Structures are given as C-alpha cells and as structure tokens.
C-alpha cells in the first residue's frame, strides 16, 4: 500500500506495556535469580537449571566452517572500521595552564541480543566489537535461551565475552541493570529488542546508562533517474522484512521510478511512502526533516551531496545497499530511530568511552586567576575564591 502523505510521528507504542514491564523489573530486583527462572519459564517457555551458558566452548566447536569463515571476515571488517574512529588524546595549554582530555573506557557493559524466528549473531558482533575496540574490560551478554547456537557461541568465545546469560526480554534488561546472584550488574546496556525490551531500557535508564530507545526500522531512499529501480525495490523490501511497522519512504525526482516502484510494491502487504520532489537538494531537505535510521543516496555522484546531510543514522552511497551496512560494511547497524538521529548517531566506540578532562596550573596568568576569584565571589562562593587565591597570591 502506498501513501503520499508522510505521517508526522512514527509508531512507538511501548508506553502501553510499561505497567507490565515495571512489574517484571520489580520482581527481578526483589527476588533475583528465582524471579528470572520463573519469568523464563513463563515467557520463553524455558525450564532452566542455570542462567549462565556453560557450554560455550562445546557449542562453538560445532560451528559450520562456512559460518566460521563469514564471522571471521566480517569481524575483521568491523574491527577495522571502529579502530579508525578511536579518538586521540587531546591536550594543550593557554595562559600558563596545561589542559586536556583523557579517554577512558566504561568498565562493565551489558549487551542484549534479541531473539525472534532466528538467532541474531550480527547484533552480537555489532554491539561487542566497538566495546572491545574501545577497551571495555567486562562484557556480559543476555539473549533468549533458545537462541544460543554454535554461531552465537563462537562469537562469544572469539570476543572473550565474560558471561553469556540465557535470559530474554524485559527480565534480561532488569538483571543487567540491577544484578542478581548469577548476573553481573553493569554500567551501561546496549542493544536492540522488541517493545518489552525498549520499555525496560526506558525504565532502567534512571539507574544505568543505555544506548537509546529504538523503534521500528526506518529507511529513506533518495533517488534520481540514474537509480536502478530493481535495486531500489529490493532495498525497500529488505527493510520491510523487519516487520509491518517498518517506516519506508522513497523520495525521488523520477516519475519513471515512482511508476516502477508502485507496480511492484503495491502488491506487498507493508506500507510505504513516496514523495515526489523537483531536485535532489529538495529531497535532502525532506530527509533531514525526517532524520531516518537508514538513508540511501541512490543518485548520480552521491559523495557530492554528503556535506548536505545533517540527520541520519547511517548513509548508503550509490549502489551500496543498506543491508550491507546491516551486516558487513563496517559501520554499525544499531542505529537511532524515531528522529533521534537529530542528536546522536549509530553505535560507535564513543558509546563505550568517557572523556575525563584535566588541568595543571603550571604558571597561570594572574589576571585570569583574579577574574576567576571575582566570578566566584559574585556567585556567593567565598571559599572558592579563597581556595584559588591561596595558591597564587
């Protein structure tokens, strides 16, 4: 079904499940492992003897060679991307004061890997690799127990995951946020998930850092007459695979492309939107206003338009399919949705690093010192002024 009018807001209905999720969080906080075992039996239909996966080596040894080779190759690609984004130590000096920033990794990180019809090893790679490259010392992973297979185990072993927990849903987020007898309390939780996972991340965010609250998948395709309509259609279908609430928009200057897309996609069950524009500059204005998760620049000379993009989670240039970013290009597939790309980007090493600033007053300018004292006194902080003055008078 096609729609020409873009909705002003995107679907985000996790508020409906907040009361239930809050009950789950409270159960885990109050009763720890016992609550987790009961909740796993209730929601994941898993009667567990242990919340910790103890068969990682055994399972990892059973990975088929073709998947092992694929994981190894993708691992190298993702590591290379994230290594190129590591910050340099920043330092300088002015008015007799040395100053700078030290980058330090978060100590303990929890990763949620969702379950569904299949396991999602790509999400484990996308979340754990930037954490390891950033220098995180302890990484703990939670995923539904029926989704721990040889591929997940192989990645966990390769990335030296400290523990793999057999827990799904809101109860997994609660366990990572507050800790239990078996589950380590972490400093930050990252990873995608369903409406219950997102609601739980929202609720625990007052107690533990999170990467963000993510909604359904989003794709904006900007295309001109040079775009291969078959590839455009495939990209739109690919993102629609994430579910019926996927938010998919074609913004184009081409009537031919509109006709071809409609001819194919009007048969589909998912909803999509088309915006006809007069120029690619106008299309970019539309995309910047939407601030999508994925943005595809399917135009002639796409790099020449990059400087005009202000809001997007990840950008696919030319023939590059967004699906390649989802798996192996290098950038992360854990991306902001629901217009959050206005203020933040996809998962990077910076999500696992914190800047610590320092100053060393070697021979500070006397006038600067006196001005600091003056402002301290103006604000009513007399001992701030005295503390400064005692050093330099």
Swiss-Prot record:
<feature type="binding site">
    <location>
        <position position="217"/>
    </location>
    <ligand>
        <name>substrate</name>
    </ligand>
</feature>
<dbReference type="InterPro" id="IPR022695">
    <property type="entry name" value="Histidinol_DH_monofunct"/>
</dbReference>
<feature type="binding site">
    <location>
        <position position="326"/>
    </location>
    <ligand>
        <name>Zn(2+)</name>
    </ligand>
</feature>
<feature type="binding site">
    <location>
        <position position="379"/>
    </location>
    <ligand>
        <name>substrate</name>
    </ligand>
</feature>
<feature type="active site" description="Proton acceptor">
    <location>
        <position position="293"/>
    </location>
</feature>
<feature type="binding site">
    <location>
        <position position="112"/>
    </location>
    <ligand>
        <name>NAD(+)</name>
    </ligand>
</feature>
<dbReference type="Pfam" id="PF00815">
    <property type="entry name" value="Histidinol_dh"/>
</dbReference>
<feature type="binding site">
    <location>
        <position position="384"/>
    </location>
    <ligand>
        <name>substrate</name>
    </ligand>
</feature>
<dbReference type="GO" id="GO:0008270">
    <property type="term" value="F:zinc ion binding"/>
</dbReference>
<dbReference type="GO" id="GO:0005737">
    <property type="term" value="C:cytoplasm"/>
</dbReference>
<feature type="binding site">
    <location>
        <position position="171"/>
    </location>
    <ligand>
        <name>NAD(+)</name>
    </ligand>
</feature>
<dbReference type="GO" id="GO:0051287">
    <property type="term" value="F:NAD binding"/>
</dbReference>
<feature type="binding site">
    <location>
        <position position="239"/>
    </location>
    <ligand>
        <name>Zn(2+)</name>
    </ligand>
</feature>
<feature type="active site" description="Proton acceptor">
    <location>
        <position position="294"/>
    </location>
</feature>
<dbReference type="InterPro" id="IPR012131">
    <property type="entry name" value="Hstdl_DH"/>
</dbReference>
<comment type="pathway">
    <text>Amino-acid biosynthesis; L-histidine biosynthesis; L-histidine from 5-phospho-alpha-D-ribose 1-diphosphate: step 9/9.</text>
</comment>
<keyword id="KW-0520">NAD</keyword>
<feature type="binding site">
    <location>
        <position position="384"/>
    </location>
    <ligand>
        <name>Zn(2+)</name>
    </ligand>
</feature>
<keyword id="KW-0368">Histidine biosynthesis</keyword>
<dbReference type="GO" id="GO:0004399">
    <property type="term" value="F:histidinol dehydrogenase activity"/>
</dbReference>
<protein>
    <recommendedName>
        <fullName>Histidinol dehydrogenase</fullName>
        <ecNumber>1.1.1.23</ecNumber>
    </recommendedName>
</protein>
<feature type="binding site">
    <location>
        <position position="194"/>
    </location>
    <ligand>
        <name>NAD(+)</name>
    </ligand>
</feature>
<comment type="similarity">
    <text>Belongs to the histidinol dehydrogenase family.</text>
</comment>
<feature type="binding site">
    <location>
        <position position="326"/>
    </location>
    <ligand>
        <name>substrate</name>
    </ligand>
</feature>
<dbReference type="InterPro" id="IPR016161">
    <property type="entry name" value="Ald_DH/histidinol_DH"/>
</dbReference>
<dbReference type="InterPro" id="IPR001692">
    <property type="entry name" value="Histidinol_DH_CS"/>
</dbReference>
<feature type="binding site">
    <location>
        <position position="239"/>
    </location>
    <ligand>
        <name>substrate</name>
    </ligand>
</feature>
<keyword id="KW-0862">Zinc</keyword>
<feature type="binding site">
    <location>
        <position position="242"/>
    </location>
    <ligand>
        <name>substrate</name>
    </ligand>
</feature>
<comment type="function">
    <text>Catalyzes the sequential NAD-dependent oxidations of L-histidinol to L-histidinaldehyde and then to L-histidine.</text>
</comment>
<keyword id="KW-0560">Oxidoreductase</keyword>
<feature type="binding site">
    <location>
        <position position="294"/>
    </location>
    <ligand>
        <name>substrate</name>
    </ligand>
</feature>
<keyword id="KW-0028">Amino-acid biosynthesis</keyword>
<keyword id="KW-0479">Metal-binding</keyword>
<dbReference type="GO" id="GO:0000105">
    <property type="term" value="P:L-histidine biosynthetic process"/>
</dbReference>
<feature type="binding site">
    <location>
        <position position="242"/>
    </location>
    <ligand>
        <name>Zn(2+)</name>
    </ligand>
</feature>
